[in-house]
Amino acid sequence: MAETIEVLVAGGQADPGPPLGPELGPTPVDVQAVVQEINDQTEAFDGTEVPVTIEYEDDGSFSIEVGVPPTAALVKDEAGFDTGSGEPQENFVADLSIEQLKTIAEQKKPDLLAYDARNAAKEVAGTCASLGVTIEGEDARTFNERVDDGDYDDVLGDELAAA
């Protein structure tokens, strides 16, 4: 009977210590093989927190499914900061270009509720607002109004590219 373990690991930097070791220790799987497979599959996310699901059988066989990092982690990575603002409506910690915002929306496409690029950009902008990140020098609310007005249609178009 298959069992499942869900963990959040730094892309390409998993090791046999916590959180993996304590979860995998009592299972029949080869911990080092699982760690190596996770690192191989997550190396593109280098250091960014990535959700990983490990499914294993009683015979020690396993499969790994890598999810998409949380939107906040992608925003922090793209903008180059570690911690969001304590007062996100007043103190801004970074600014993203519309192209950077679109890149994040494309990476998050499988997890977003949006049906087009404009709404996907607005979803990501919502996360930017809570972190204290501006978009094109404007706060997220102003940015979203401009998206609604069609100001960024030339960049956002209709569809997101496949991630």
From Swiss-Prot:
CDD domains: Ribosomal_L11. InterPro entries: Ribosomal_uL11, Ribosomal_uL11_C, Ribosomal_uL11_C_sf, Ribosomal_uL11_CS, Ribosomal_uL11_N, Ribosomal_uL11_N_sf. Gene3D superfamilies: Ribosomal protein L11, C-terminal domain, Ribosomal protein L11/L12, N-terminal domain. The keyword RNA-binding applies. One of its GO terms (molecular function) is structural constituent of ribosome. PROSITE patterns: RIBOSOMAL_L11. Forms part of the ribosomal stalk which helps the ribosome interact with GTP-bound translation factors. Part of the ribosomal stalk of the 50S ribosomal subunit. Interacts with L10 and the large rRNA to form the base of the stalk. L10 forms an elongated spine to which L12 dimers bind in a sequential fashion forming a multimeric L10(L12)X complex. This is Large ribosomal subunit protein uL11. The gene is rpl11.
